[in-house]
């Protein structure tokens, strides 16, 4: 039987976690990045399709390649983050379905409908980005997800000649709490949910 996690874990993962814009000068190791993926990969996706592909940018050279794609409001926070993850989706994710979903011919569901393939890849890679954020929080890291960037520039700079397309960016590191804004409100249950 499943058991609820502790109140402390809920605080770490949700209620006390914040989106960070400033970072401490504490590096994030490659081993930690591997740990993050080892956790996030278990999050569910449609037919186990797992379309997300992630580039972890850790070097000054990588950040300079990314710089022209960033909006002005996201520039400094990204250049100073220890890691920036480009969460992309593989437009031909279905080629891995014989391995990932061997129960039937799931590949044909998507090869016969390019629109379904694109919708599935984008939706599920977005879900996987959320799993990455939760994995970061679980390992004591902070994040700053962003959609304010030039996707075409990122695709040209990092994914030219491939089947990958960028979805969003996530800055990862140890946040500087002195640079946090006041916590913004969230919608109440009554405002966001319905019961039928």
UniProtKB/Swiss-Prot annotation:
One Pfam family here: Nitroreductase
Cofactor(s) in the UniProt record: FMN
The keyword Cell division appears for this protein: no
Presence of the UniProt keyword Ligase in the record: no
Induction: Up-regulated by the nitrogen regulatory protein C (NtrC also called GlnG) and repressed by RutR.
EC number(s) stated in the UniProt entry for this protein: 1.1.1.298
One GO term of the biological process aspect: nitrogen utilization
CDD domains found in the cross-reference section: RutE-like
Superkingdom classification of source: Bacteria
GO MF term (any one): 3-hydroxypropionate dehydrogenase (NADP+) activity
Regions annotated as coiled coil: none
Family per record: Belongs to the nitroreductase family. HadB/RutE subfamily.
Function text: May reduce toxic product malonic semialdehyde to 3-hydroxypropionic acid, which is excreted.
Name of the protein: Probable malonic semialdehyde reductase RutE
Naturally occurring in which organism (per UniProt): Escherichia coli O157:H7
């Amino acid at each position: 039987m499943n058991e609820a996690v502790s109140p402390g874990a809920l605080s770490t993962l949700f209620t006390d976690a914040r989106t960070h814009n400033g970072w401490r000068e504490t590096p994030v190791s490659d081993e930690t990045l591997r740990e993050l993926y080892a956790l996030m990969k278990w999050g569910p996706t449609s037919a186990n399709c797992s379309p997300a592909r992630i580039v972890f940018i850790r070097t000054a050279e990588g950040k300079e390649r990314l710089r022209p794609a960033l909006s002005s409001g996201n520039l400094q926070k990204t250049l100073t983050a220890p890691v920036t993850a480009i969460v992309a989706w593989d437009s031909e994710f279905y080629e891995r379905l014989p391995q990932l979903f061997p129960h039937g011919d799931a590949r044909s569901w998507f090869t016969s409908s390019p629109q379904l393939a694109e919708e599935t890849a984008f939706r599920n890679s977005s879900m996987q980005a959320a799993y990455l954020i939760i994995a970061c929080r679980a390992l004591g890291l902070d994040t700053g997800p962003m959609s304010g960037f030039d996707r075409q520039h990122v695709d040209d700079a990092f994914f030219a000649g491939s089947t990958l397309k960028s979805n969003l960016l996530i800055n990862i590191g140890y946040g500087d709490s002195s640079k946090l804004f006041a916590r913004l409100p969230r919608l109440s249950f009554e405002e966001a949910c319905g019961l039928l």
